[in-house]
Structure formats: structure tokens, C-alpha cells
């Protein structure tokens, strides 16, 4: 919280200097900033009841309206053509059709059908209908990092293969732990897909498998979110993204696909935690058939847009933009991703900045934008740029938190 207060103070000084205002009001504006107010707003927006402010969701819409109400209370004015603080963004939501989706494994030992959400979950980003069938290739950790003396792929041809990899909980100090380790699974999956794999199935960690079993949990339903090209203001088509199939599987399904016992699977995780490689191998005598079907629906979300009109008759036609995103990642099984730091802190900091700027109106106008759908592909910021309520050429600077 102390860091947030320092950041707000720094931005206020920068904005009032850039936008132009006299020292005395500037001092009063800075003194209006309250750590208690920052904490109050953050405790509300990052509470479990907001369920991680996923896009789109009722909780995110409530968060947007909360910001709009507070912006008005702190003296900001609406800037949008309809006189509101809420810039509605049309969305296209792609979801997996559980009734038509089928996943089965055929082998000499018999056929086995797996069930969506219970046995496996599909990653939402880039979700599209797909039919994938073939033999399984197991790649252990599935990491190619020659600089760290670790390469599970080598010269293997991954074209049109269904790849299975493990997601171990690597201990602190592990040779493969890096500052980006939380995204290690995603980076590995994309690397394998870029090298030609049909699909990448990641076996969940032992700790996560235990939570599934103990609490009777299921995977999070898959969905992809993009701008609805038929909606108002969304004239540009969605960004083209390659359709890919990335899924997570539980340990029972992994044991069947790999032809190993649960104990053998556990020993693989143990080896990786110790820093030992698990040999890659092709699973012969079996064929995995995955038919993924999707449904599309429209929805909406909101940017929150407000402004402080500049006090100088000429300079008020120049604009300084301040922005942060107020959406986050939602939930994963029983866990809420509260998003206090990403980006609840920036979101509430802007409220305090708004209050300060209403006390010391700068010479230039200041536009404040709380973006939405950032975590789903920067859709809120893109929509704002395409439907900017002020001339883009008149924007002097932008500060993002």
C-alpha cells in the first residue's frame, strides 16, 4: 500500500506539472490523497465476492459501475457522446459445447471415454472447434532450454502430433525456476504448437490433483473472448489468431494415455522436482480422438471513461490520458484470482488521482480510462482507441499503470 501511495503522489506531481497548475492547489491536491481511501477501494474491488472480475461477468460490470459512481463523486465529468461514464464494448464469446464435445482413447486394452470438466479442461484463449486424432507423444516437461542444459524436444518431429507434458510444482531454487516461471506452462505449450503439434495436453500438478480429489472440483469452463465485429463501434475485424488446442488433464486420464500406473506417474513428477529429466517416448498401440465443438454468443463489458476539463481556454484542448485495467482473471476451480496488484492497485490509485485533480484543475484536460478485457486480449484499450471521444492527435501524453 505504501508503494501505491508513492506511485499516486508521483503521478499527481507529473500530471499537474505536465498539464500545468499552480503550486498551492497542487499541494492541496497531493494532501487529499489518503492511504485509507486507497485501502478501502482495494478491499472492495479485490474482495472474493467480485470473483476475480473476469471478462465478461456480472461482477466486472458491478466493478465498472462502482468506478463510474466514484469518479462522479470525486468530481470527474462524463466524456462519452451519450453523457455516461460507461463505454459499452460488444463482445463475441466462444464457449465449448459440452454436449457435442467427445474425447476417447482406443487401444488394444479397450476403449475409454473421457468427460469434459471432470477429466480434462480446455484452454480458452484461441478456442475453436477442432477435430484432432492420432498417437500420443510424451515429452516429459516439454521444455527446450539448451542454455540450461535441458532439451526434451531435440530434433523430434512434432508435426501433427498430440503431445503430453507434465506440470510439476518446481521447488524454490530449482535450476529451471526463473522470474517467468508462473508462465512456464503457457510458454512451453505455445512452443510445441509452433513446432507443429496438433494439440498439447498438460498433466496437472500433484498439488492441484489433490485439490481436485479432496474437494470434488472440476476444471474451469473454457471460453474465448474477442470484439464482436457486428457490434456498435467495432468496425474492425477481430485480430486473427491461430486456432490451437491446449488442454489440461487429470492424473487418471494421464495414466491411461501414457500406459503407466498412478505410482509411476508420481515418480515422474518426483524426478522433475529433483532436476532429473523424464525421457520422451511415443505411446504405441493407442489412438486419441478429440472432437471439440464450440458455441458462440454475444455479451458486453465496459470501459469507464471520465475527464477533468482543463482550466486554460487554449490548453484545455490538449489531453493527458491516465489508464489502468480493472478486469482480472476470474477463478480457477476453488481459487479466486483477486487481482489486488494486477491491476486493482492501479485502478484505485486512479480514483485518488481523480479526487486530487478535481481539487487542482490543470490547464490541460485529463482523461481517465479504466480499461476492461485487458486480460482477454487488450480489447478494452483497442476499442477505446478505435472509438476515442477526443481527437487522438490532441493527446499529449498517456500514463498507464
PLM segments and residue spans:
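Structural recognition of the beta-strand scaffold that forms the well-ordered cores
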Residues: 43-46, 138, 162-166, 199-203, ...
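Acidic/histidine-rich catalytic neighborhood of metal-dependent amide-processing enzymes
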Residues: 181-187, 208, 329-401
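Extracellular/luminal Protease-associated
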Residues: 34, 114-237, 309, 337
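Bacterial N-terminal signal peptides that target proteins for export
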Residues: 1-11
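Bacterial N-terminal signal peptides
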Residues: 9-19
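Soluble metallo-hydrolase cores and metallopeptidase-like ectodomains found primarily
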Residues: 26, 108, 119-150, 235-339, ...
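N-terminal hydrophobic or amphipathic helices/low-complexity stretches enriched
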Residues: 21-78, 249, 253-256, 260, ...
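Noncatalytic luminal/extracellular "stalk/propeptide" segments of secretory-pathway proteins
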Residues: 51-174, 282-284, 291-296, 300-303
